[in-house]
Amino acid sequence: MKTTIKQAKKHLNQEVTIGAWLTNKRSSGKIAFLQLRDGTGFMQGVVVKSEVDEETFQLAKDITQESSLYITGTITEDNRSDLGYEMQVKSIEIVHEAHDYPITPKNHGTEFLMDHRHLWLRSKKQHAVMKIRNEIIRATYEFFNENGFTKIDPPILTASAPEGTSELFHTKYFDEDAFLSQSGQLYMEAAAMAHGRVFSFGPTFRAEKSKTRRHLIEFWMIEPEMAFTNHAESLEIQEQYVSHIVQSVLNHCQLELKALDRDTTKLEKVATPFPRISYDDAIEFLKKEGFDDIEWGEDFGAPHETAIANHYDLPVFITNYPTKIKPFYMQPNPDNEDTVLCADLIAPEGYGEIIGGSERINDLELLEQRINEHELDEESYSYYLDLRRYGSVPHSGFGLGLERTVAWISGVEHVRETSPFPRLLNRLYP
């Protein structure tokens, strides 16, 4: 009977065959231990010399790391294993014998591992990170489908930038200029006027020359937009969404979290409502904490965000930033005209901002004024202005960065490990 490592627990005390790769092995004179993986999980195969023919035992001792094989044996309980079971091997069939595998069980430097990213993905920890990423994506679709959102796919090639920055990847679009999308937000606002609640999930590109552990050049974003929704209501959706994906990972990825040595007690504390602190109060807090490198009207850096998040030890919303440091489309704060109705969600443990969101300007004249203040080409935003001409409504939205969220939940130090093939400032290969 052919099965997988994950499904093998259904076949205790039965003989099965599994297609797998050998990740590692050790042997003595009478027994060989084979560490196996098949994409669904990792399992130990035990080859006892007295219970197999001489050829099979010799094969178990000689087989090379990452060779592919069909392995047949009986699934037995093993309380020492994370899975709770292992295989007592009866026979081994080589599918392909691997050459000298470059990533050995010893430690390797980061550059070496990134040069061999196509192989590094096979390791137990990298496998765990990708499984957690997959669960976050699955839970994302689940949450938005259950809450009445329609999935919309905005274009990746665009003629304008929603953030109003120059850090864009430029390309020729026949006889016109085009840019790789920084965000699908403006198109999602248009879709929200048709469908009410919408979300997108896709790649975004930012030509930022940043080399921090939080930045990628190409990354994936989840961008919901909601008609007839104010800023406070949007914050509630955001915290419900983040709580949902954290709980989903806790429910479905315990083996992966264990493989990463993740302290899950920190994740178990994540529950709504999240704490909120205004930008003004955050500045005051930082001053009291001894930060003298930040003044009102300046954006927070990583040390500032970390200090604020550590104070709460939970995801925390920083609300109502100064107008001058935020994009042109954000709705003014009626209680303070120098700030806008926005919030950044800061993840704990030093992972920084994972969500940026705001209520959007719904008044045509004000939006035109802001576009001019930011010295943007009004013609490029004519379709966006149309949304305020024909049935404009209060509406809000946000964007969640997938890779930073994966980094926080999985507990990995650098965001490069959360993308299967990360694009960094000096890395376009593999």
From Swiss-Prot:
One of its GO terms (molecular function) is nucleic acid binding. It comes from the Bacteria. Homodimer. InterPro entries: Aa-tRNA-synt_II (IPR004364), aa-tRNA-synth_II (IPR006195), aa-tRNA-synth_II/BPL/LPL (IPR045864), Asn-tRNA-ligase (IPR004522), Asp/Asn-tRNA-synth_IIb (IPR002312), NA-bd_OB-fold (IPR012340), NA-bd_OB_tRNA (IPR004365). SUPFAM superfamilies: Class II aaRS and biotin synthetases, Nucleic acid-binding proteins. It catalyses: tRNA(Asn) + L-asparagine + ATP = L-asparaginyl-tRNA(Asn) + AMP + diphosphate + H(+). It is an enzyme of class 6 (ligase). Its main location: cytoplasm. Belongs to the class-II aminoacyl-tRNA synthetase family. It is found in: Cytoplasm. One of its GO terms (cellular component) is cytoplasm. One of its GO terms (biological process) is asparaginyl-tRNA aminoacylation. Its EC number is 6.1.1.22. Coiled coil: none annotated. This is Asparagine--tRNA ligase. The keyword Ribosomal protein does not apply. Keywords: Aminoacyl-tRNA synthetase, ATP-binding, Cytoplasm, Ligase, Nucleotide-binding, Protein biosynthesis. The lineage of its organism: Bacteria, Bacillati, Bacillota, Bacilli, Bacillales. It comes from Staphylococcus epidermidis (strain ATCC 35984 / DSM 28319 / BCRC 17069 / CCUG 31568 / BM 3577 / RP62A).
